[in-house]
Amino acid sequence: MTAPTVPVALVTGAAKRLGRSIAEGLHAEGYAVCLHYHRSAAEANALSATLNARRPNSAITVQADLSNVATAPVSGADGSAPVTLFTRCAELVAACYTHWGRCDVLVNNASSFYPTPLLRNDEDGHEPCVGDREAMETATADLFGSNAIAPYFLIKAFAHRFAGTPAKHRGTNYSIINMVDAMTNQPLLGYTIYTMAKGALEGLTRSAALELAPLQIRVNGVGPGLSVLVDDMPPAVWEGHRSKVPLYQRDSSAAEVSDVVIFLCSSKAKYITGTCVKVDGGYSLTRA
């Protein structure tokens, strides 16, 4: 184990998009970073190599499925026995301590996002078959797992490892950031389970901030609006969304969101906890 001389950040979903920007920003601020990924191994390993080229021994990658399914794999598991989500989350935090002896920042960024309509019948108008119901249960486990339950287990593991660390080995600035959604109170049609999960994450942010305040661990949320838009939506649809953003009539860049995360992780925000900051250009003020 390397002597714990620099602060360490664990970023989930760090291989691409917002997660990558957050990890790069924290690394630029002097953090060593643990880059979690699920399926994006090539991207995560490439980012780790880039960061280690800038500063040796400053980045590692760890794979884990954060859906709430007991049989999902974990790095190093032989697959012979189910591995619970609780265990997977504990192992992510443990990876930071194994490699660097500490974990100062946790960013819960990993998030599944896709529609789960309440009313979805087959072509003949019948109720979904058993296979469809099983698919819905899997989607629920995935969406709630990545967006709410995994963040809870990760925060729990983060706090327990902090409490078990001798005072002389602790840092001076501990922060947890949950990536919420600026539009939770103006839900996107058909995304019911995702919206439920993000609402739960906001509640977790406030509750954990209250419970962990005596340990001087700050917990905040950052809620992007239109940010790093996906490639598979028709351009005309995205332009329609962009035109409704009061400020600049565009989506945010990844850096504009990650800059807020990095600020909330810094000592400049040491009196801020339990709040959720919207980074949406005012978009949540307009959509009914």
UniProtKB/Swiss-Prot annotation:
GO terms for biological process: response to methotrexate; tetrahydrobiopterin biosynthetic process. Substrate binds at S175. The keyword NADP applies. Pathway: Cofactor biosynthesis; tetrahydrobiopterin biosynthesis; tetrahydrobiopterin from biopterin: step 1/1. Pfam families: adh_short_C2 (PF13561). It catalyses: (6R)-L-erythro-5,6,7,8-tetrahydrobiopterin + 2 NADP(+) = L-erythro-biopterin + 2 NADPH + 2 H(+). PROSITE patterns: ADH_SHORT. CDD domains: PR_SDR_c. GO terms for molecular function: 6,7-dihydropteridine reductase activity; oxidoreductase activity; pteridine reductase activity. One of its GO terms (cellular component) is cytosol. The active site is at Y194 (proton acceptor). It comes from the Eukaryota. Keywords: Methotrexate resistance, NADP, Oxidoreductase. NADP(+) binds at residues 17-40. Belongs to the short-chain dehydrogenases/reductases (SDR) family. Homotetramer. Exhibits a NADPH-dependent biopterin reductase activity. Has good activity with folate and significant activity with dihydrofolate and dihydrobiopterin, but not with quinonoid dihydrobiopterin. Confers resistance to methotrexate (MTX). This is Pteridine reductase 1. The gene is PTR1.
